[in-house]
Amino acid sequence: MLRVAVLSLHTSPLVQPGVGDGGGMNVYVRELVSALAHAGVDCTTYTRTWRDDLPAEVMIEPNHKVVHIPAGAIDMPKGDMISIVPHFTEGVLDHVNAHGGTDVIHANYWLSGLSGHSLKHELDVPLVSTFHTFARVKAEGGDPESEFREQSETEVIG
């Protein structure tokens, strides 16, 4: 059975859309992973622990579970999460290694892309990245992001 590690560092597919950073990406990740799970793909979505009362793992449906990785303060703003990417990455790596590995990584958003880029080299598996937004495109629309983000996206794309 194909095993996919789905990365969604800054927002969980369990978050209600419209709450905090919950929105289209949450719905996208949850629905994509659900479709893969129904097709017989073993999917684990890794997200940052976003509430104190969350279990370490939540089984959503057969072949689809969410794993909460403790990384940073519960109420950490998305703009500060670059600092926790290494800690999140280490937590994902530990879980993946403890549970038999993965065949492919699918990262969502640029922060998860940075984590996935490190993990693909550590685990020697392919990385698929869905950025959802790009710094370069946002800048063209008058909403500039950091130069670091743009450089990071370029590195992940390779």
Residue ranges and their predicted role:
Residues 1-58, 62-66:
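N-terminal subdomain of nucleotide-sugar transferases
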Residues 4-5, 120-140, 149-150:
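Active-site proximal beta-strand in glycosyltransferases
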Residues 15-19, 77-79, 138-143:
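Short acidic, glycine/proline-rich loop/turn micro-motifs
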Residues 64-97, 145:
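A short, charged, and often flexible helix/loop element on the N-terminal side
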Residues 95-112, 116, 125-128:
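Short N-terminal targeting/anchoring amphipathic segment
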Residues 147-158:
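Membrane-proximal helix-turn-helix segments that form the acceptor-binding/catalytic region
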